[in-house]
Regions:
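Minor-groove-contacting beta-hairpin "wing" of winged helix-turn-helix DNA-binding domains
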Residues: 69-80
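Short alpha-helical segments that sit at the start of domains
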Residues: 1-24
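Short, amphipathic alpha-helical interaction segments positioned at domain boundaries
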Residues: 83-106
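Short amphipathic alpha-helical interaction segments
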Residues: 47-58
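Short helix-capping/hinge SLiMs at alpha-helix to coil transitions
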Residues: 27-33
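Exposed, interaction-prone assembly regions rather than primary DNA-binding/catalytic cores
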Residues: 106-129
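A short acidic, leucine-rich amphipathic alpha-helix
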Residues: 37-44
Length: 129
């Protein structure tokens, strides 16, 4: 059985109609070279972009479908091999590390105390005098 047929059969097992529809459409896009742009997937499924994004997330998290995407390659696809898997996984790890660093900075950032905010700032004259 080829991978497209495998995922087509897996999509038929999904009970939610919208999720099943997106899964069936994705079964035609196995391998990075067969990536589908989000806009094309939205048009094909007749759903909104936010809804399709959420469904793709559901396919990954709830149904454990290996759907890939990464910077430098437009579109989404079902990961077909270990090279694609690790490329996507490493990019996700990099993004995770960036988010973690940003979170730490925000957690530790100095916030002006209420007293600092309540201080009256003298208004400068019209010509800086």
């Amino acid at each position: 059985m080829n991978p497209n047929d495998y995922y087509r059969l897996k999509s038929a097992e999904i009970t939610e109609a919208d999720v099943r529809l997106v899964a069936a459409c994705m079964s035609d896009h196995v391998g990075e070279e067969n990536a589908v742009r989000l806009e094309a997937l939205v048009a094909r499924c007749g759903l909104g972009e936010r809804q399709v994004r959420d469904i793709l997330e559901t396919l990954v998290k709830a149904y454990r479908w290996p759907i890939g995407a990464h910077a430098g390659k437009a579109g989404r696809w079902i990961i077909a091999n270990d090279k694609e898997r690790w490329h996507v996984a490493n990019e996700l790890l990099s993004r995770e590390n960036e988010l973690r660093a940003r979170r730490r900075i925000i957690e530790q950032a100095h916030l002006p105390a209420k007293l600092e905010l309540d201080k009256q700032v003298p208004q400068m004259g019209l010509f800086g005098s």
